[in-house]
Amino acid sequence: MSRSLIQTTNTTPAAVAVNGIIPLGSVLRRFGCNCRLNGNNIEVEGTGYYTVEGTVTVQPAAAGAVSVALFENNVAVPSAVATGTAAAIGDDVTLPISTTVRETCCEGASSLALVLTDGASTVTNVSLRVEKE
């Protein structure tokens, strides 16, 4: 079993609508060939488990709930949803994501994306790390 890692970061503010994919920015660190950045998605390829850890900071366009979820191949990963509440417009809300996903034999690459699932916001900071165990 080989280890691979990718870490991305984005500090450029971006307006994201509900159900919009959050821009991951650029690669900060990368090792191995099982994880790669493809647009605003991380592609993972190779049988095994992948630990996904990330933090998204948003400034909601309205007071109330805001949520971020990890999607794998356009399907929400049930254990990877973070929700916070903004007391006022523009409050910083930090949303942590931490989970493990499994890549099985012979599927080809899987695509991982962070999606804003509730509360249109300006995303001000994103850090995402995916590591093959």
What are these regions (language model features)?
Residues 1-133:
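Extracellular jelly-roll beta-sandwich "head" domains, especially the C-terminal globular C1q domain
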